[in-house]
């Protein structure tokens, strides 16, 4: 029986290996992680991550040919194919801090592989890494191998999953990308991994390239997607200034077959573990290769995203008589997108910090985010979310300004304003009349995801702001915001 081991039981490693186990019942798949609580979660009825459809896949395979373990060394030693799906966060200090990828976890994984391997291995980069990482990993493996004349083949097999649809993306991917060395051994390794995916992925969707093309393709894909979001968000600011409707503009340009409609929804900004991190990594790589114009081009995608978040906060404050001090603001949604509990780099963090910084009292509701997670996120510094550190509790002054509710109506009770920051479907179905009746007047609603009908809410009595939509008379009369 072929044995696959995956180092890293997070948002990528867990779902990916579960689907491989489901589609390849004759392959033994073991997911390993040094975090005992995380592995306990994968072995329990309540998985450590929320992803639609994941529970069912794990339930079918776990204990049959899918296993989760903290015994990293044993399972790495036994496997013929080792996926590495560890975090590659942005560096917080030292050379490249604030841009470069921190490969500490990747290097640690490579050293474990070298230390315990007693047979040839195919090592698969599943994490997003800088171009030429495979070359560095080859050197680490070659100089640290304890098992004699062991041969390693490094492959790049980046993930292209979207949280909230990860299982669907794995079942029916747009493409599977496999990059390897252009040698007989490298081509054989590519063929071996391709044979795994070929169990359920059509041949024309499995793309093979050289290593460097595969590594760069992942960074480029995320940069292009984030670029579309920042582009439509930039247009949303112009729409508000001119009276145009960003939804109509996006629909119009999306009908152009050369552009297409996806990733053209204006919002308070993009978040998640990948977009910002990968673009900053791309910026750093461009700078290292002496391409400052290219670096500046991609850095502007991040700058527009930051601008969109600060613009939203400024709109809230300026609309409410230029002060939110002591006013309750209900925040609906804290995850970076619907159908996930992931809060990494969520725009809600910056919005909530901005409101609290102006002395607002913030009441947060999200159906998949715990109070512990909210408080943890709001005390973190930028780029800290994937770095181990001793977290300090929220300061007493900040804590009294932040509360977490498990009900949208309770969050809005007694509030002066509601901010919608995640596009959860349930927010489209709320009884906004009931919510309005329990709020201070004038009652404001700031829709950062364009999930509600602004005209309907205005008829109820709300003062409504929707990203990129024509401003109502109240907002037009308020001072302009940057």
From Swiss-Prot:
Query: Is Nucleotide-binding tagged as a keyword?
Result: no
Residues involved in substrate binding: 159-163, 218-225, 258-271, 336-337, 449
**For this UniProt entry, which residues form the secretion signal?**
none
Example GO molecular function term?
NAD binding
Pathway-wise, it operates in: Nucleotide-sugar biosynthesis; UDP-alpha-D-glucuronate biosynthesis; UDP-alpha-D-glucuronate from UDP-alpha-D-glucose: step 1/1
Listed under catalytic activity are: UDP-alpha-D-glucose + 2 NAD(+) + H2O = UDP-alpha-D-glucuronate + 2 NADH + 3 H(+)
Q: Where is the active site?
A: 274 (nucleophile)
The entry's NAD(+)-binding residues are 8-13, 33, 38, 86-90, 127-128, 163, 274-277, 344
Keywords from UniProt, A to Z, are: NAD, Oxidoreductase, Phosphoprotein
Keyword NAD listed? The answer is yes
Annotated protein name in UniProt = UDP-glucose 6-dehydrogenase 2
EC annotation from Swiss-Prot or TrEMBL? 1.1.1.22
- What organism is this sequence from? Oryza sativa subsp. japonica
Q: To which protein family does this belong?
A: Belongs to the UDP-glucose/GDP-mannose dehydrogenase family.
Q: Name one GO cellular component term.
A: nucleus
